[in-house]
Amino acid sequence: MLKGATPVISVFILGGAGKPKNISSLRDILRKNCTIALIGEQQFFSQCENPDFALVEIENLSRITAPNAIILCKEPFEVPNVVLLPADAVGLLSSDNLNAAEWIRRCGIRAITLGMSSKDTLTLSSITSDSAVLCLQRAISDLSGNTLDPVEIPLSLSRRYDAFSILCAAAIFSLSGKIDILKQILF
């Protein structure tokens, strides 16, 4: 890492067989507002030498050692045979994704639920074609250990995105300590 450079936040995307739309929408949102590296089975792309985020989508991972890793569990989620995760990893999942919830619980990592119900940690209290209101319904800690208190943040949308992609991007920004950027960026 370059001296003085911010460490790359790694986002590992698991599950979601046959659903490429969710990841492409998430990529679009992140790419507009920060620098990313995309790492997949057959591809590697990086916007710069030291990107803000590395999105890793590889099947059959057996071990993740990246510090402060974010594990995004998409549906449908098939429980991996064996995946060792760092203790400080954070799982992002829909509250309806019961397979992922059980797997995250067994792995012993922190979970943040994303969805449209009152039981979700991060939700949208409203959404239209050009705006949404993000609602952090309970306090969480970002990857640096800072507490993020419950808050509602108005978001500006450049186009219509599915709610899960918006929530994933917002969770990634929030966990990386960039929750304030959500008020200024265009999704």
Regions found by a protein language model. Name each.
Residues 1-91, 99-110:
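Phosphate-binding loop of NTP-binding sites
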Residues 60-66, 115, 140-142:
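Short, Lys/Arg-enriched charge-dense amphipathic segments
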Residues 75-77, 96-97, 116-119:
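Short, acidic/turn-prone active-site loops that include or flank metal/cofactor-
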Residues 92-95, 111, 124, 169:
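Residue-level signal for inorganic ion chemistry
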Residues 107-119:
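Short, solvent-exposed linear motifs at loop/edge-of-secondary-structure regions
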Residues 116-187:
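Adenine nucleotide phosphate-binding catalytic loops in nucleotide-utilizing enzymes
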